[in-house]
Regions:
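Short, Lys/Arg-enriched, disordered terminal segments
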Residues: 1-4, 69-71
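Short basic helix-loop element that most often maps to the first helix and adjoining turn
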Residues: 4-23
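Short, basic-rich loop-to-helix N-cap that marks the start of a DNA-contacting helix
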Residues: 38-51
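Short, charged recognition helix plus adjacent turn
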Residues: 9-12, 51, 58-71
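Flexible coil/turn residues that form the inter-helical turn or adjacent wing/linker of helix-turn-helix
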Residues: 2, 13, 39-42
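Recognition helix of helix-turn-helix/homeodomain-like DNA-binding domains
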Residues: 26-40
C-alpha cells in the first residue's frame, strides 16, 4: 500500500483522519494505524474509502495495490 499517496489523496479531498475513521466504522487510532501501514485495511474498508474519496480505478490500484493489478 502507498500510505503517502493515501494520505495526500485524503487531504486533497478535504478529509481529516477522524472523518474517514467515522465513515468506515473505526476509531481514529485504528484508522491511523491502518493509514500508516501498521495494520492492514480490509477489502471492505478499501471499498468504503475509495467511494468516499471518489477514487478512480487507477487511484485504487496505485494506492492500495502499488500499481500491481493488471490493466
Amino acid at each position: 500500500m502507498n500510505n503517502d499517496l493515501l494520505k495526500r489523496m485524503r487531504a486533497y479531498r478535504g478529509y481529516k483522519q477522524y472523518e474517514i475513521a467515522e465513515i468506515i466504522g473505526l476509531s481514529r487510532q485504528t484508522y491511523n494505524y491502518k493509514e500508516n501501514g501498521r495494520l492492514p485495511l480490509t477489502s471492505e474498508e478499501i471499498v468504503k474509502i475509495s467511494r468516499e474519496l471518489s477514487l478512480t480505478l487507477k487511484d485504487v490500484n496505485d494506492i492500495f495495490f502499488n500499481g500491481q493489478l493488471p490493466n
